[in-house]
């Protein structure tokens, strides 16, 4: 797991006794009067005398190359017997010799946040350049070095020139210093007797990320109100506007009262100033403060400092402990650009054999150097997992922990807020292949990849700090579809929910987010999730405090942050507990949350719930792997408006209304004043249908133009169902041939049913529809009047005139979308017609054989036949909707009565050939069956519906007595729907009549 040594290495001898020789080599490297290459590996020399190896170093001394062996690589980094590895700085950085140390201290009571009074002032210093500069981190000699485009090399102690002393004009001027580890302060200007303008240094080799400050103040005077104003912040929003106070440390207070870092300040204000340059805007932070002691050495900081030296001291203590060192192995993962060590810890109970059943847990921290709160959480985690409690032992026995406590030591040392010495954010480069530029994240990813080949990694968590939100929360990953993997969708939220239950006063589950943004694809969280780690999280800890429970309105201290490490271990035990009661309890709560919020839709996308939208918006790259949102409910409204604005805008409301009006006008031109039949379930007021098992039956009656001898007859067995309101509607019937156009029938709103029983002309027919109950035998008669319609040729011409996709009112052509909408509506109307049409059966007794021939011949029937066949449609519900073709003629199942002898004499097998083209229609949704059946087999309206198998073939059978005649085309025996036997009179035919029923049935393919 240590770094490869194939490249040129200056730092392997950094902890050896010949450290001075190493420093001299660097001085020779930058000197102009000697050879530019003073130290090379043997494999870079073309002389065959030297073997190709990386273990021999060549030094240029006295005009010749002198070989020597490379020192052994330091795999352990820390040692209980030897000194710690010294920190290495960029060669141009000035570093004071004094080592800064602080004590740890916990306030007796939680420190409250600052409550604005409204009297805070916003100081502006337009003429600060003319005032006295009391501190400047870089002078003219170092300006060129700071403007280097990239990092060059490093050395222990940084710049070796004499340090420039701070300005000390008079006795009452404060003395500032920040040239120590993790310090950050670039310039201080004294604008008044007790007022100072401060400028923090941006990250090295960048011109941004001015957020972290940490500096020293001496020559203080007690009982004097000082004002400090930092003028070059770049974030528009800050926790200082929400009550966060700066941190203060007094050495005298630490010595006399054992008090460490504490929150201080009055008149705290974060505001926009007028120092914008090149289109950039800056923000100022101002506060006032009275020092507790005179001639004191004090410190101000953005958050509790935790330096690289603090980490080394902590790891050295672990290594020197005979108990903890047994189950905690410290190794060097790699070296940074400045040749500082990146440590990796392996924590587990020693394995007697190679046990691959243990799952792995990975924790990393401090990829952003200014987020020091992540190091305090890591310290709390290590304190607990290395302790002697029973839960800690159980965790070590169950898991293998891989811990990288500080991913960016270079940035921590120089006081950066976000970047490494490469000038880049490491948490956006986990996908990079540049091992030399981003070694810590490259080797971390490689280590995890190799670990996953041996064992399962159950959880990955990267610790961060957040500068705009309160509390502690998590970011997770959820790139899968909820509808397909709902279980996984909820399982990724179980661990954060458990964490919120174990520490409800500091962890907020409502602030957690579980989405993958494109701008975050280079983060460790997303990369590890894509590598196969299901529980991949970023733990975000606020710089301020909590808004939850009894911690509400208070700042987080170091102990609060350390306690988060303990709660993390406790939640890990709950998550992997063999007793899955807590697991399923959290899963059930998540399901209830989803059900509760699923009804609240914030956009037209029905798959997006409110909780998903609130978890979708994350911040830009200026913050941590975090969000710009806050914890208030107004954020949901803001996000809701953002989600609605994401919808692509197509047309204005006026345009949409115009399109809808045009479609309605065209439909009215086609159908006249008619309307579609309402469904019976829509007209049911109470919604209780006692006929739940009975199918719906609709009876359609055909009428003709009134003749002199036409009379009115009653139809037995038809009555309205009680409690229902039935309506009649005009229906459209297509002819049997493409040459005949649509016949559109007028609407009848009269609920009384009457049937014209004698000569009926099909060209002037009108369908009347009524719904019949099937569970009770009818006992009365219902009359139905005939309503004439328009002539066939008039309706045909009207349909032709309105078939164009051009608006007659606007005179504009329709778009493709409008045409598609219009066609869809026409198809839907045709489906309604085919669904509700159900003709009745009339008696065909005493009919001539010529009439049967006319019925079989569709063209002749349309022109000559004077008796319309009453058709029966088997109304069936299909699971898959079907769409009729535009020009397919409508056909109905028909039951025709005729004498058996007449049928056999007048219907040859060749007559069926006229129907064969109907069977050969390709890609049609309807097929036909033709068969004959004796009238004695036809029962009354008490029969049940039977399913008819789908078939693309036409079968014809003639039933006579017990014999069945079938043509060769017969391929299957279709089950038949028994239709009520209806005649013009109330007389039921006897079984001796021997009438044959001719049936033509439509089959629809789903």
UniProtKB/Swiss-Prot annotation:
Its main location: cytoplasm. Its EC number is 3.4.17.-. InterPro entries: Cytosolic_carboxypeptidase, Pepdidase_M14_N, Peptidase_M14. Induction: Up-regulated during ciliogenesis. Its cofactor is Zn(2+). Pfam families: Pepdidase_M14_N, Peptidase_M14. Zn(2+) binds at residues 368, 371, 464. This is Cytosolic carboxypeptidase 3. It comes from Mus musculus (Mouse). The gene is Agbl3.
């Amino acid at each position: 797991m240590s770094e490869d040594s194939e490249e040129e290495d200056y730092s392997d001898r950094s902890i050896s006794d010949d450290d001075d020789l190493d420093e001299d080599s660097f001085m020779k490297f930058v000197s102009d009067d000697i050879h530019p290459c003073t130290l090379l590996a043997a494999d870079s020399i073309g002389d065959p005398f030297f073997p190709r190896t990386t273990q021999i170093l060549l030094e240029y001394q006295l005009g010749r190359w002198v070989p020597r062996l490379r020192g052994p690589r330091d795999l352990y980094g820390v040692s209980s017997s030897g000194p710690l590895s010294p920190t290495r700085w960029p060669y141009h950085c000035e570093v004071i010799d004094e080592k800064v140390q602080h004590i740890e201290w916990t306030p007796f009571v939680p420190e409250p946040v600052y409550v604005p009074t409204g009297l805070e002032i916003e100081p502006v210093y337009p003429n600060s350049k003319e005032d006295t500069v009391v501190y400047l981190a870089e002078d003219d000699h170092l300006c060129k070095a700071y403007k280097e485009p990239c990092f060059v090399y490093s050395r222990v102690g940084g710049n070796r020139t004499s340090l420039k002393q701070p300005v000390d004009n008079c006795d009452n001027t404060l003395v500032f210093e920040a040239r120590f580890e993790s310090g950050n302060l670039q310039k201080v200007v004294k604008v008044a007797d007790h007022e100072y303008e401060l400028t923090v240094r941006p990250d090295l080799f960048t011109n941004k990320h001015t957020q972290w400050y940490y500096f020293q103040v001496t020559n203080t005077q007690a009982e004097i109100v000082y004002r400090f104003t930092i003028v070059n912040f770049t974030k528009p929003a800050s926790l200082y506007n929400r009550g966060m106070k700066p941190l203060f440390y007094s050495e005298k207070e630490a010595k006399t009262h054992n008090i460490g870092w504490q929150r201080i300040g009055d008149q705290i204000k974060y505001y926009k100033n007028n120092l914008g340059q090149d289109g950039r805007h800056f923000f100022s932070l101002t506060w006032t403060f009275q020092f507790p002691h005179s001639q004191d050495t004090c410190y101000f900081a953005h958050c509790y400092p935790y330096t690289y030296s603090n980490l080394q001291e902590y790891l050295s203590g672990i290594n020197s402990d005979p108990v903890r060192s047994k189950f905690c192995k410290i190794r060097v993962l790699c070296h940074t650009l400045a040749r500082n060590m990146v440590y990796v810890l392996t924590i587990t109970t020693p394995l007697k054999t190679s046990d691959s059943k243990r799952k792995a847990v990975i924790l990393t921290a401090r990829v952003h150097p200014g987020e020091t709160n992540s190091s305090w959480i890591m310290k709390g985690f290590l304190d607990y997992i290395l302790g002697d409690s029973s839960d800690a032992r159980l965790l070590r026995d169950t898991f293998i922990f891989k811990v990288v406590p500080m991913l960016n030591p270079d940035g921590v040392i120089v006081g950066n807020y976000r970047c490494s010495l490469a000038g880049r954010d490491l948490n956006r480069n986990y996908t990079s292949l540049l091992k030399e530029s981003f070694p810590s994240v490259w080797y971390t990813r490689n280590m995890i990849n190799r670990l996953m080949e041996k064992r399962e990694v159950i959880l990955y968590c990267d610790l961060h700090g957040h500068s705009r939100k309160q509390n502690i929360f998590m970011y997770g990953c959820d790139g899968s579809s909820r509808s397909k993997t709902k279980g996984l969708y909820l399982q990724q939220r179980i661990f954060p929910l458990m964490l919120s239950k174990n520490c409800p006063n500091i962890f907020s589950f409502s602030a957690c987010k579980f989405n993958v943004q494109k701008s975050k694809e280079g983060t460790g969280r997303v990369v590890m999730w894509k590598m196969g780690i299901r529980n991949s999280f970023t733990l975000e800890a606020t710089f301020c405090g909590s808004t939850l429970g009894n911690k509400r309105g208070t700042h987080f201290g170091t102990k609060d942050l350390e306690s988060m490490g303990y709660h993390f271990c406790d939640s890990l035990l709950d998550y992997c507990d063999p007793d899955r009661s807590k697991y399923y309890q959290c899963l059930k709560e998540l399901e209830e949350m989803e059900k509760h919020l699923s009804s609240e839709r914030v956009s037209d996308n029905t798959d997006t719930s409110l909780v998903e939208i609130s978890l979708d918006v994350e911040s830009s790259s200026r913050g941590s792997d975090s969000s710009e949102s806050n914890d208030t409910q107004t954020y949901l409204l803001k996000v809701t408006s953002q989600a609605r604005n994401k919808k692509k805008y197509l047309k204005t409301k006026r345009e949409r209304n115009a399109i809808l009006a045009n479609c309605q006008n065209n439909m009215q031109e086609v159908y006249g004043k008619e309307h579609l039949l309402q469904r019976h379930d829509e007209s049911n007021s109470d919604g209780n249908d006692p006929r739940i098992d009975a199918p719906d039956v609709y009876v359609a009656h055909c009428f003709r133009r009134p003749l002199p001898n036409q009379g009115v007859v009653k139809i037995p067995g038809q009555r309205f169902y009680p409690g229902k309101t039935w309506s009649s509607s005009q229906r459209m019937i297509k002819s049997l041939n493409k040459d005949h156009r649509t016949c559109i029938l007028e609407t009848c709103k009269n609920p009384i049913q009457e049937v014209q029983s004698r000569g009926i002309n099909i060209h002037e027919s009108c369908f009347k529809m009524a719904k019949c109950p099937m569970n009770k035998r009818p006992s009365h008669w219902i009359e139905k009047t005939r309503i004439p319609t328009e002539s066939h040729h008039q309706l045909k011409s009207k349909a032709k005139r309105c078939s164009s996709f051009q608006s007659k009112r606007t005179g504009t052509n329709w778009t493709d979308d409008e045409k598609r909408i219009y066609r869809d509506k026409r198809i839907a109307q045709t489906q309604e017609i085919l669904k509700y049409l159900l003709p009745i059966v009339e008696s065909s007794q005493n009919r001539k054989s010529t009439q049967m021939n006319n019925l079989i011949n569709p063209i002749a029937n349309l022109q000559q036949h004077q008796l319309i066949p009453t058709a029966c449609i088997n109304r069936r519900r299909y699971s898959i909707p079907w769409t009729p073709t535009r020009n397919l003629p409508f056909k109905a199942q028909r039951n025709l009565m005729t004498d058996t002898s007449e049928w056999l004499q007048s219907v040859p097998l060749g007559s069926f050939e006229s129907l064969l083209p109907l069977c050969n229609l390709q890609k049609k949704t309807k097929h036909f069956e033709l068969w004959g059946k004796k009238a004695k087999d036809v029962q009354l309206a008490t029969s049940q519906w039977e399913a008819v198998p789908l078939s693309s073939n036409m079968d014809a059978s003639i039933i006579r007595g017990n014999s069945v005649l079938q043509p060769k085309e017969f391929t299957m025996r279709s089950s038949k729907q028994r239709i009520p036997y209806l005649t013009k009179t109330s007389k039921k035919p006897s079984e001796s009549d021997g009438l044959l029923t001719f049936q033509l049935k439509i089959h629809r393919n789903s």
